[in-house]
From Swiss-Prot:
Compartments (UniProt record): Cell membrane
Family as reported in the entry's similarity comment: Belongs to the G-protein coupled receptor 1 family.
Function: Olfactory receptor specific for N,N-dimethylalkylamines trace amines. Trace amine compounds are enriched in animal body fluids and act on trace amine-associated receptors (TAARs) to elicit both intraspecific and interspecific innate behaviors. Ligand-binding causes a conformation change that triggers signaling via G(s)-class of G alpha proteins (GNAL or GNAS).
Protein name stated in the entry: Trace amine-associated receptor 7a
Sequence ranges on the Extracellular membrane side: 1-47, 105-121, 188-212, 296-309
Length: 358
């Protein structure tokens, strides 16, 4: 029997006996149950710090991505096929903050799962669905940016609202179908039945994934990653070439003769740069986790608990990063936030507000 267990996107409750902060004693998750999992509680100080750090991440993911979705869906100036992809990506990150991070906070700090066996499986499915949905969205966004930068004049006719809708539908359907079917058919536990039986206890949320499915999970992350790296490499080369062409003209000539195509290309390059940073942040956040998952599966479950928890929460925190990236690089997003938080969004005709002043 294959005795290697991997966590399907961070949803296994490991005993917290190797934590960064020392535990005070060993207890049971449910004191009156013989089949209860063992927990190692933190002392009050570290416990409060961890709740604050994890809770802040969840709140930022929920509020920040809610602002992104509200901005794009409310203001008509932002109604574009590319921005609809960004709004859908924000929805995935919003759902991570709402349905995954709060429960994982309790699991990570308390060392126990108190939300029932049914939601344990849902929680795992949500993690898988939202993670893969995010990477598929980012992959489509990179293709969108490549078309916009390489051929800005024909871009509006090539990447239409219909194309954007198909990309969004594909990203969500494939992610949800894959994650839920994998866990609810039990395919992930094939060959691990005896080990699962030994590990099962009340207050745990253990999801066993055999080597075959760990490898498939890794491929679902790796293939879109390679596509994005290739596409953004081409975008970088195109942007560099366009910049060199502009530099060949004198400043005075450039002001007089700068074409509509040049202005559009400049705007699209800036958007590509910002979204490229979002892609890089996603890859840097999730790549260590996926590398660790495949190492664990094939080398015998060797990752220390505290290392695993750090990798999981780095990945979770990515859901809170995109709104910060947009706020830093997009003046229109900062203006939209101001209109939303001051309540001006409730005024009549606020949806027609100009977010791009000259």
């Amino acid at each position: 029997m294959d005795k290697l267990v991997d966590h399907f996107l961070s949803d296994q409750s490991r005993t917290m006996n190797e934590d960064l902060f020392s535990a005070t004693s060993t207890e049971l998750c449910y004191e009156n149950l013989n089949r209860s999992c063992v927990r190692s509680p933190y002392s009050p100080g570290p416990r409060l710090i961890l709740y604050a750090v994890f809770g802040f991440g969840a709140a930022l993911a929920v509020c920040g991505n809610l602002l992104v979705m509200t901005s794009i869906l409310h203001f008509r100036q932002l109604h574009s096929p590319a921005n609809f992809l960004v709004a859908s990506l924000a929805c995935a990150d919003f759902l991570v903050g709402l349905t995954v991070m709060p429960f994982s906070t309790v699991r990570s700090v308390e060392g126990c799962w108190y939300f029932g066996e049914s939601y344990c499986k849902f929680h795992s499915c949500f993690e898988g669905s939202f993670c893969y949905s995010s990477i598929f969205h980012l992959c489509f966004i990179s293709v969108d940016r490549y078309i916009a930068v390489s051929d800005p004049l024909t871009y509006p006719t090539r990447f239409t609202a219909s194309v954007s809708g198909k990309c969004i539908t594909f990203s969500w359907l494939l992610s949800i179908i894959y994650s839920f079917s994998l866990l609810y058919t039990g395919a992930n536990e094939a060959g691990l039945e005896d080990l699962v039986s030994v590990l099962t206890c009340v207050g745990g949320c253990q999801i066993a994934v055999n080597q075959s499915w760990v490898f498939i999970n890794f491929l679902l992350f790796l293939i879109p990653t390679l596509v994005m790296m290739t596409v953004y490499s081409k975008i970088f080369l195109i942007a560099k070439q366009q910049a060199q062409n502009i530099e060949k003209m004198s400043k005075q000539t450039a002001r007089a003769s700068e074409s509509y195509k040049d202005r559009v290309a400049k705007r699209e390059r800036k958007a590509a740069k910002t979204l490229g940073i979002a892609v890089a942040a996603f890859l840097l956040s999730w790549l260590p986790y996926f590398i660790d998952s495949i190492i664990d599966a094939f080398l015998g479950f060797i990752t220390p608990t505290y290392v695993y928890e750090i990798l999981v929460w780095i990945a979770y925190y990515n859901s809170a990063m995109n709104p910060l990236i947009y706020a830093f690089f997009y003046p229109w997003f900062r203006k939209a936030i101001k209109l939303i938080v001051t309540g001006k969004i409730l005024r009549e005709n606020s949806s027609t507000t100009n977010l791009f002043p000259e």
